[in-house]
Amino acid sequence: MQIILLEKVANLGNLGDIVKVKDGYARNFLIPNRKARRATKEAIAEFEVRRAELEKIAAEKLAASQAVGEKLNGQSFEITQKSGVDGRLFGSVTNGDVAELLKKAGFEVEKLQVRMPEGPLKMIGEHSVQVALHTDVVVDITINVIGDHA
């Protein structure tokens, strides 16, 4: 299916690009999330009229993400979990836990934006975690998992 992108999509293209994707990806993800429209002649003409407005909105989102990224980059956060004497956690620290911790600290972050390269954290200690605030803004933070031997 030919679609026109209404915003930058990772591994696909930038605002205004006309790309061919599988029908299911377009119908089930891109179009419902308002990231793309079918590339009909009418849609392309309408997009060209709204192009400046959409580019302005995209630039504002990027600027806001960069501002938050500057505050967040390199920061360290602590989370306490129950653990055994050998340093292994009972359970794990997931991206949802990290997103909740960041929200309490005043940062608006969804759990899908938190990337944990090694998967959920299962040991006490310091761990590096990435937060993707925008497709172009990815910052590194440190999560210090403290064990509660109670």
Curated annotation (Swiss-Prot):
GO cellular component annotations of the record: ribonucleoprotein complex; ribosome
Keywords: Ribonucleoprotein, Ribosomal protein, RNA-binding, rRNA-binding
Leader sequence residues: none
Record GO terms (molecular function): rRNA binding; structural constituent of ribosome
A Pfam cross-reference name: Ribosomal_L9_N
Example of a GO biological process term: translation
SS bond list: none
Domain of life: Bacteria
InterPro entries, per database record: Ribosomal_bL9, Ribosomal_bL9/RNase_H1_N, Ribosomal_bL9_bac/chp, Ribosomal_bL9_C, Ribosomal_bL9_C_sf, Ribosomal_bL9_N, Ribosomal_bL9_N_sf
NCBIfam families in the record: L9
HAMAP family: Ribosomal_bL9 (MF_00503)
Family: Belongs to the bacterial ribosomal protein bL9 family.
Function, as annotated: Binds to the 23S rRNA.
Name used for this protein in its record: Large ribosomal subunit protein bL9
UniProt organism field: Burkholderia lata (strain ATCC 17760 / DSM 23089 / LMG 22485 / NCIMB 9086 / R18194 / 383)
